[in-house]
Amino acid sequence: SRGASADMEPARIEDIVETVVRLASTDYDLKKKYDFRQIEIVRDYDPGLETLVCDHTEIEQVLLNLVKNAAQAMSEAGLSRTPRITLRTRRAGEYGCIEVEDNGPGMDEHTQRRVFEPFFTTKAVGSGTGLGLSVSYFIVTEQHKGAIDVSSSPGEGTCFTVCLPLGGKSAR
C-alpha cells in the first residue's frame, strides 16, 4: 500500500459533497433497484467549516459509496415513507466531519460491528463485493489519518460519519 496520497490539496467540504450528489444523481443503472431522483436530499452544511487538505477524488469515492449504499438499503427495505438522505457537515475540534444519514431500515449491532470488514456484505449475492466500506475505511483512516464511524438501530435509519483532519494536520 502506498503512504499518504500524492494528490492532497485544499478542497471545500461542501464542494466535495455537492460533487457526490451530482455523481449519484446521474447513476442510472437499470440493474440497481433504486432511482436516486426519487430520494429527498437534505443539506445541512456548517457555513463556518474551512477547507480540508485531502485527495478529493478518494473522499468523493468514499462518500459516493456511502450515498449509494444508503439509496440501495432504503429501496430494498420497501419503505412506506419517502426515502431521505441527509448530508451534514460540521466541525469537531481539529476535524471536519461529513455525515451521510438515511431514514432506511437501519442495522443491528452485529452488522454495525462487521460493516467495515473486507467481504462482509448484507446485499444479495451478485450485487455487492463487500469491499466498498473496507476500502472506504482504509482511505479515511490510513490515507487521510481520519476516522469513519457508523451509528444505527433497526428501523431507525443509519448514519455514517467521516471525520478528516482540518488544515492537513495529521491525526496521528
Where is each model-derived feature located?
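Acidic ATP/Mg2+-coordinating residue in the GHKL
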Residues: 102
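Glycine-rich ATP-binding loops of the HATPase_c
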Residues: 144-151
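A conserved beta-strand-to-alpha-helix junction within the catalytic ATP-binding
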Residues: 9-22, 42
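Short helix N-cap motif at coil->helix boundaries in the Bergerat
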Residues: 13, 106-114, 128
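Conserved catalytic submotifs in the C-terminal HATPase_c
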Residues: 35-50
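Short beta-strand-loop-beta element adjacent to the nucleotide/active-site pocket used for signaling
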Residues: 80-98
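Detector for a conserved hydrophobic position within an alpha-helical segment of the HATPase_c
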Residues: 140-141
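Short alpha-helical Gxxx[C/S/T] motif in the catalytic ATP-binding
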Residues: 132-137
